[in-house]
Regions:
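Short glycine/proline- and aromatic-enriched beta-strand/turn motifs that initiate or cap beta-hairpins
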Residues: 22-83, 282, 286
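Outer-envelope beta-barrel architecture signal
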Residues: 33-41, 78-86, 123-131, 171-179, ...
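Transmembrane beta-barrel strands of outer-membrane/channel proteins
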Residues: 39-49, 86-94, 129-139, 164, ...
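Extracellular loop and loop/strand-boundary signature of outer-membrane beta-barrel proteins
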Residues: 51-59, 70, 95-103, 145-151, ...
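Residues that define the transmembrane beta-barrel architecture of outer-membrane proteins
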Residues: 59-67, 103-111, 125, 150-160, ...
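Residues on the lipid-exposed face of transmembrane beta-strands in outer-membrane beta-barrel proteins
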Residues: 67-75, 109-117, 131-135, 160-166, ...
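Outer-membrane beta-barrel transmembrane domain signature
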Residues: 147-233
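Predominantly the C-terminal beta-signal and adjacent terminal strand-loop region
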Residues: 180-182, 190-192, 211-214, 218-286
């Protein structure tokens, strides 16, 4: 009888141990690392000024309108430390000469991808730095120039990128401050000779059109400073955007500056139907 009781007790202990091991294995396997995409869609309006001596020695000034999209996500590998960002924008500008008798139009498309290493020196404060790649294409159109009315531009760059964010509360309202900076370090860009027409390029004069870009002849800084004000599932983005670029090649000098007010919406999205408390969520911005 005692032997039977001991055997039963051993079987019960073995069953309990196997059950606990199975529960732990299922729990460990069921925990997934989720990396939400922080998406921002914004409308920008502000002031712009342009100097392009290929078209005119005069500086034109006017307004700019830009539609911008931004997507940030933690990387699959080392997701606590590495984040990636993709940005795309389309812009249109209308500017007048100092005498206000000539109008200049500027159309641009920008695409960029970057990866940054981040850390949190203090609670609620995140900083990150890294690099990426950027593509810019666009054109200036000056109707009064009958011979050379268009100045095209195109560049591919390796960029240096930085991000900083700080989360706080204003009363009961959660607010996240964010600053993003991007600068090309080295790249390649297009520029014709001074006075060279695009008809000459069309006829086959392709020499000297591509140039190696660095800070001495192809400088640009793009800085976004914004506040994301939480409204529940989405946040209202209000901010300021500075975009400054300059260049000098073939005796052609270019200067372009925009100062824009930013209004948009930001939200975090996951490609799942539901959340579980055991799931590990790693956002791109803390």
């Amino acid at each position: 009888m005692n032997r039977l009781v001991r055997i039963l007790l051993c079987l019960v202990c073995l069953w309990a141990s196997l059950s606990a091991f199975a529960d732990n294995s299922i729990s460990a396997d069921s925990v997934r690392t989720l990396r939400p995409v922080t998406s921002s869609y914004s409308f920008e309006y502000g002031a712009a000024s342009t100097l392009d001596t290929y078209l005119s020695p005069l500086r034109y000034q006017g307004s700019t309108i830009t539609i911008n999209g931004s997507w940030l996500k933690a990387m699959r590998q080392n997701s606590q430390r590495l984040i990636m960002a993709f940005d795309a924008s389309i812009g249109l500008e209308s500017q007048l000469s100092p005498a206000r008798n000539s109008r200049l139009y500027d159309f641009s498309l920008d695409f960029s991808w970057s990866m940054m290493y981040r850390w949190c020196p203090i609670e609620h404060f995140q900083v990150g730095a890294g690099g990426g790649a950027a593509l810019n294409i666009g054109a200036l159109y000056l109707a009064r120039n009958s011979n050379n009315p268009v100045s095209a531009r195109a560049s591919v760059d390796v960029t240096a990128n930085a991000i900083a964010s700080y989360s706080l509360h204003i009363g009961r309202l959660p607010v996240r401050l964010i600053d993003r900076v991007s600068m090309p370090v080295v790249g390649a860009f297009f520029s014709p000779e001074y006075g060279e027409t695009y008809y000459e390029i069309y006829l086959g004069n392709h020499a000297g059109l591509a140039h190696c870009g660095w800070w001495g002849n192809h400088f640009r800084i793009d800085n976004l400073l914004a506040a994301d004000i939480s409204l529940g599932t989405v946040a209202l983005r209000v901010g300021y955007h500075l975009d400054f670029s300059s260049g000098k090649v073939h005796d052609i000098v270019t200067r372009h500056t925009t100062h824009s007010l930013v209004i948009g919406l930001t939200h975090d999205s996951l490609n799942i139907t539901g959340l579980d408390k055991s799931q590990n969520i790693i956002p791109a911005i803390y």
